[in-house]
Amino acid sequence: MTIAPMANDLEDFESLLEPDFDAKQFGNDLLKATNNNDTTILDLNTPLKKLNYDLHEIDSRIDQLMNSNPLEIIELIYKNEHVNSTIVGELKPSLGYMNMSYDRLKNQVLDPYERARKVQLALSKVYQTSFLLRGALLYIHLSNKLNALSKTAQLSTSTAINLASLHYQLEITLEENKNLKSLRKIKQLDQDIVSPNKRELITFLSLQMCKECLNSIKIKSNKEIISQLAYSLYLLSSQEFESAINKIVLSNVTMSSQILSKILNSIRMFPDAFNEVVEKGYNIYILETLLQNIKTDNVTNSSRSIAANKSRLGNLLSEYTSMKSKAGSGTPRDLFWSKVSSAFKKDFDISVNRGGPVGKSLLKNKDFIINTMKQSMKKSSDNSDYQSYLDVMLNSVSISLNK
């Protein structure tokens, strides 16, 4: 039995059956079609009549369709029911198996995983809280110890060294637990105790280190104290450590330059004067050796990046050199002899260019000056590495003496 004629019974209403049918757009188009653009009165009766007529027409056609094709309609109904029952019957075992598999997956994997995840999250929070409290207790203990030690007596070198160690431990505690800085108690301790004490301690260590390196006697007899002061200052601030070394070197440069400047008028006294300068250069050599013997492999400085901490060279001399490399001055001896040479060259050139008895005396005694430098510079170091600094000093007089 054919059912093809049924497809044409609603052909006048095909637009209403489209998947993208828009009732608002259809109503708007109907209003436009039944109203005149030239009038200001909106006619709603005509489109309503049109819609009522269409509804009546659809009902009429449905009744006519059912009356004229009852068998086809019944056949379609039974066919759809049969298809539905067939699909359900064939898929039901598979769906049941899938549901059973999912239930087993849910019970054996998903639910235990979710419970484990919640437990892990809770444990993580407990661990974080415990770690934070442990760090806070350690920081408070170290702060109280630092406060008590700083109030026991007048600040001395040994006390300052112990305080520097406590400050370093506080720094490590903060490095290991960044969240400590967010605690109000920690902020208060840092503001009231730690930071003020650290500033005072840095100033004290820097001054003491400069005093201990003031002359040859002190620097030779107090090597251990100087090493401890340098290491403690470095623990507190690598920048202040560098600054203190520079002050020591430049202080010796100033005294050496004054000695050499005064001797230009009496060149026969040059050997004694230059020996004094060499002795100061030897003091810087001792300082350099002390720095080289102080290991920093296990030091972590929060003022540097993690990458910088990992790439350390192993001792205070290499740390100082790496900080000075940007300025181009290198080691303390590099700084000392380059500054002394530069100052002496300036004074020497002025005296030679000015002429007169002093200038003539300098030119006349050029070999004497050079030989004195060569002999004396050997005493500026305990090994043969003085040669490069000898060349630096010879360069300070080479141009003038070649005139």
Swiss-Prot record:
**Where is it located?**
Golgi apparatus membrane
The UniProt transmembrane annotation reads none
* InterPro entries hit by this protein: Cog5, COG5_helical, COG5_N
Q: Which domain of life is it from?
A: Eukaryota
Q: Which residues form the signal peptide?
A: none
CC per GO annotation: cytosol; Golgi membrane; Golgi transport complex
Q: Which UniProt keywords apply?
A: Golgi apparatus, Membrane, Protein transport, Transport
Task: Tell me the GO BP annotations in alphabetical order.
Answer: cytoplasm to vacuole targeting by the Cvt pathway; intra-Golgi vesicle-mediated transport; retrograde transport, vesicle recycling within Golgi
One of the entry's Gene Ontology molecular-function terms is: identical protein binding
The record's annotation in Pfam families points to: COG5_C, COG5_N
| Membrane topology type | Peripheral membrane protein
* Function recorded in the entry: Acts as a component of the peripheral membrane COG complex that is involved in intra-Golgi protein trafficking. COG is located at the cis-Golgi, and regulates tethering of retrograde intra-Golgi vesicles and possibly a number of other membrane trafficking events.
Instruction: Tell me the protein family, please.
Output: Belongs to the COG5 family.
What is the additional note? Present with 468 molecules/cell in log phase SD medium.
Subunit structure and binding partners = Component of the conserved oligomeric Golgi (COG or Sec34/Sec35) complex which consists of eight different proteins COG1-COG8.
What is the protein's name according to its record?
A: Conserved oligomeric Golgi complex subunit 5
Q: Which organism's genome codes for this protein? A: Saccharomyces cerevisiae (strain ATCC 204508 / S288c)
What gene does the UniProt entry assign to this protein? Answer: COG5
